[in-house]
Amino acid sequence: MRKIYATGKRKTAIAKVWLTPGKGELSINEQSLNQWLGGHEAIKMKVMQPLLLTKQEQSVDIKAVVFGGGYSAQAEALRHGISKALNAYDIAFRAVLKPKGLLTRDSRVVERKKYGKRKARRSPQFSKR
């Protein structure tokens, strides 16, 4: 029985994912998916997407630790980590995951604040007179 480790990232959220062959148990921060997310069905589907695409929702166990960011960023980091772990588990899954963009790290992060500006791009109000 081999244990596969992968990390997923999105904005400031980081997901550490361990994948093992099993019965389809999903543990996130020592909680089930429903306890961790509550009633957010759209975010649940986002997390389950790589498992559903590869038809592995009943054949692998996933244990994950997620921190940083908000729920949406954490869910996308988790999806990225699960996709990378599935790719390492069986290279044939790459053909399914890659076209959907699930193996690609979303590099969009918050732009830094610049001096002389109020925010990243917002300038102080300009007055001609």
Swiss-Prot record:
GO molecular function annotation: RNA binding; structural constituent of ribosome
SUPFAM superfamilies assigned to the protein according to its UniProt record, in alphabetical order: Ribosomal protein S5 domain 2-like
InterPro entries: Ribosomal_Su5_D2-typ_SF (IPR020568), Ribosomal_uS9 (IPR000754), Ribosomal_uS9_bac/plastid (IPR023035), Ribosomal_uS9_CS (IPR020574), Ribsml_uS5_D2-typ_fold_subgr (IPR014721)
GO biological process, any: translation
GO cellular component labels: cytosolic small ribosomal subunit
Keyword Ribonucleoprotein appears in the UniProt entry: yes
Keyword terms: Ribonucleoprotein, Ribosomal protein
Family of the protein in this entry: Belongs to the universal ribosomal protein uS9 family.
NCBIfam families: PRK00132.1
Protein name: Small ribosomal subunit protein uS9
Species of origin: Helicobacter pylori (strain Shi470)
Lineage: Bacteria, Pseudomonadati, Campylobacterota, Epsilonproteobacteria, Campylobacterales
Gene it is expressed from: rpsI
